C-alpha cells in the first residue's frame, strides 16, 4: 500500500467469537485496514465491550444501527460474521449502498474465495463468500491435487473443538456441509465433493484437525511425487497467512483395493474407476489473537477474510491526493 493511499475502513457485523477476532486482527496486525464499526445485537457482549474500550464505534441494534452511525459513509468493506439467514438480510440493505461485503457465513450469495487458490479471481465482486472453516482448511489441498491430476471424488472431515463452536456455527451445520461440498467442486476442482463436520467434545479442547481424501486415476509414481510436491507447496502457501496450518503426517497415496465400490462415490456420468486414494491429514492451530489456540477453525476463517480484504484494498482505496482534489 503506497503512502498516498488511504486505509480501507471496515465494519464487522457480529460481535461473537469470529467478529471479535476479526476486529483484533484488523487493529493489531493490518497496515491496510482500519476499524470503522463493530455491530452486534447483544449490548452486553464481550465483543462490543472490547470494541468500546478500543475506541471503535459500536451499535447493539444490528445492521440498522450501522446505517445510523455518523461514520457510516466512510465504511468501505463490511465483514459479516452473523449467520447464513442474517447475511441475506444484511446484504439486501448494504449492497445497494455500495458497501463491499465479505461473508463469513455459509450463505454463499457471492462467489467463493479461498485465498490460497483463487485470491485474484473476484477482486471486484460486491459480495464474496469465505466458504467455511473446513473449506478454508481443506479446499487448498483438493486444489493442489487437482492441479496435477483430475480428482474424481474428494471428501473432507473437519474436526473442531466443541468449545470453539458458538451458536452461529451450531445453527449453520447443514449449510456448512452444503456450502463446503459445493466449494470442494467449484474451487477445489473435484468432480464431486462431500464435507463432514465433527464437534469434538474433548476437554481440554484439541486443535482443529482435518482429513482430506481424494480419489484419482493415476498409477505413475512420478505423478504421485508431483502430487506430494504440490500439496507441500500449498501447505506452505496457506501458512503465510495462517501460521498454525501444517501437515500432521506425510501424504499417503495408496491403491484402491479391487472390488471396492468406489463407483458409488463418483459424479453422475463418470465411469472410469479411480485407481488410487490420496490421504492428507492436517492440523490448524490458532494464532490466539483473541480466541484460544485450539480454535484454529475460527482463526483460519478470520485470517482468510483479512487476507482477501487486504488484497483488494487497492481496488477500494483511492489515492489521498485525488480525494482531496475532488472534494
Curated annotation (Swiss-Prot):
Pfam families in the record: AcetDehyd-dimer
Protein's organism: Rhodococcus opacus (strain B4)
SUPFAM superfamilies with a match to the protein in the record: Glyceraldehyde-3-phosphate dehydrogenase-like, C-terminal domain (SSF55347), NAD(P)-binding Rossmann-fold domains (SSF51735)
Protein name per UniProt: Acetaldehyde dehydrogenase 6
Family indicated by similarity: Belongs to the acetaldehyde dehydrogenase family.
Molecular-function annotations in GO: acetaldehyde dehydrogenase (acetylating) activity; NAD binding
Record field: transmembrane: none
GO biological process: catabolic process
Active site: residue positions: 133 (acyl-thioester intermediate)
Record field: catalytic activity: acetaldehyde + NAD(+) + CoA = acetyl-CoA + NADH + H(+)
NCBIfam families reported in the protein's UniProt record: ac_ald_DH_ac, PRK08300.1
Binding site for NAD(+): 15-18, 164-172, 297
InterPro entries referenced in this protein's UniProt entry, alphabetically: Acetaldehyde_dehydrogenase (IPR003361), Acetylaldehyde_DH_C (IPR015426), NAD(P)-bd_dom_sf (IPR036291), Semialdehyde_DH_NAD-bd (IPR000534)
Top EC class for this record: oxidoreductase
EC id: 1.2.1.10
Keyword field contains Oxidoreductase: yes
Keywords assigned by UniProt, alphabetized: Aromatic hydrocarbons catabolism, NAD, Oxidoreductase, Plasmid
Amino acid at each position: 500500500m503506497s503512502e498516498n493511499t488511504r486505509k480501507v475502513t471496515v465494519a464487522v457485523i457480529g460481535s461473537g467469537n469470529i467478529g471479535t477476532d476479526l476486529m483484533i486482527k484488523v487493529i493489531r496486525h493490518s497496515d491496510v485496514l482500519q476499524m470503522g464499526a463493530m455491530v452486534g445485537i447483544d449490548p452486553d457482549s464481550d465483543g462490543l465491550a472490547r470494541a468500546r474500550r478500543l475506541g471503535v464505534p459500536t451499535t447493539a441494534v444490528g445492521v440498522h444501527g450501522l446505517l445510523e452511525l455518523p461514520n457510516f459513509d466512510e465504511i468501505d468493506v463490511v465483514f459479516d460474521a452473523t449467520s447464513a439467514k442474517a447475511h441475506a438480510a444484511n446484504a439486501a440493505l448494504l449492497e445497494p449502498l455500495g458497501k463491499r461485503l465479505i461473508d463469513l457465513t455459509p450463505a454463499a450469495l457471492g462467489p467463493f474465495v479461498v485465498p490460497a487458490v483463487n485470491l485474484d479471481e473476484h477482486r471486484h465482486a460486491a459480495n464474496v463468500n469465505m466458504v467455511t472453516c473446513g473449506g478454508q482448511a481443506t479446499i487448498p489441498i483438493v486444489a493442489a491435487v487437482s492441479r496435477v491430476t483430475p480428482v474424481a471424488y474428494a471428501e473432507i472431515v473437519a474436526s473442531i473443538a466443541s468449545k470453539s463452536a458458538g451458536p452461529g456455527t451450531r445453527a449453520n451445520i447443514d449449510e456448512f456441509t452444503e456450502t463446503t461440498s459445493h466449494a470442494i467442486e467449484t474451487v477445489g476442482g473435484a468432480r464431486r465433493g462431500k464435507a463432514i463436520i465433527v464437534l469434538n467434545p474433548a476437554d481440554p479442547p484439541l486443535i482443529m484437525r482435518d482429513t482430506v481424501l481424494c480419489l484419482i486415476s493415476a498409477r505413475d509414481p512420478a505423478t504421485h511425487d508431483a502430487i506430494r510436491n504440490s500439496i507441500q507447496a500449498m501447505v506452505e502457501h496457506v501458512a503465510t497467512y495462517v501460521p498454525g496450518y501444517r501437515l500432521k503426517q506425510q501424504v499417503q497415496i495408496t491403491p484402491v483395493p479391487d472390488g471396492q465400490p468406489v463407483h458409488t462415490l463418483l459424479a453422475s456420468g463418470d465411469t472410469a474407476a479411480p485407481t488410487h486414494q490420496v490421504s492428507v491429514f492436517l492440523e490448524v492451530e490458532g494464532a490466539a489473537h483473541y480466541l484460544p489456540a485450539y480454535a484454529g477453525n475460527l482463526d483460519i476463517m478470520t485470517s482468510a477474510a483479512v487476507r482477501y480484504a487486504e488484497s483488494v484494498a487497492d481496488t477500494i482505496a483511492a489515492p489521498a491526493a485525488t480525494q482531496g482534489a475532488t472534494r
